[in-house]
C-alpha cells in the first residue's frame, strides 16, 4: 500500500463521530493526510481516532486551509466533498475489495478483513459497524 497517497492534504471530516466517517479519517491518516474533524458529541467511534484532533459541538466549519469531507447527515449545514466521492478516492488509491448489497455487508467485510489480517496481510478496512475481532 502507498502510505503517502494523500500526503500534503489537510482533511477535515464533518460528522467524524460516525462509523463511516471515523473510518475514512483513519484511512486518510494512514495514507499520509493531516486529519481533523468535527462532530456534535463524542461517540464510540471517536475513541478510535487516536492522534486526530476532534472539535465537539458548536460550529462545524473547518479552520482555514482545510478541505472538507462531509457526511450526508451534515451536507445541508456545510459544503464539502460528499463522503461517497471521498470513498471513491480512497478506493482508487490502492487495491480494494468492495462489498455491496442489501444485507450482510458489515459481516462480510469484517470477515474478509479479519481473514486477510490473520493470514499475514496488512489490510485497511472501512466497515459500517463494530467488529470486535478487528479491535
Where do the model's predicted regions map?
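Phosphate-binding loop of NTP-binding sites
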Residues: 27-30, 62-64, 72, 76-135
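N-terminal leader/targeting and accessory segments in enzymes
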Residues: 1-86
Amino acid at each position: 500500500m502507498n502510505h503517502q497517497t494523500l500526503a500534503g492534504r489537510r482533511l477535515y471530516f464533518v460528522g467524524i463521530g460516525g462509523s463511516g466517517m471515523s473510518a475514512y479519517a483513519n484511512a486518510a491518516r494512514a495514507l499520509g493526510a493531516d486529519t481533523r474533524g468535527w462532530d456534535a458529541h463524542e461517540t464510540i467511534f471517536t475513541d478510535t481516532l487516536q492522534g486526530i484532533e476532534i472539535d465537539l459541538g458548536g460550529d462545524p466549519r473547518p479552520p482555514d486551509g482545510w478541505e472538507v469531507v462531509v457526511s450526508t447527515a451534515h451536507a445541508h449545514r456545510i459544503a464539502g466533498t460528499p463522503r461517497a466521492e471521498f470513498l471513491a478516492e480512497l478506493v482508487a488509491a490502492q487495491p480494494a475489495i468492495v462489498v455491496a448489497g442489501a444485507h450482510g455487508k458489515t459481516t462480510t467485510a469484517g470477515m474478509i478483513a479479519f481473514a486477510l489480517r490473520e493470514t499475514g496481510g496488512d489490510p485497511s478496512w472501512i466497515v459500517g459497524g463494530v467488529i470486535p475481532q478487528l479491535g
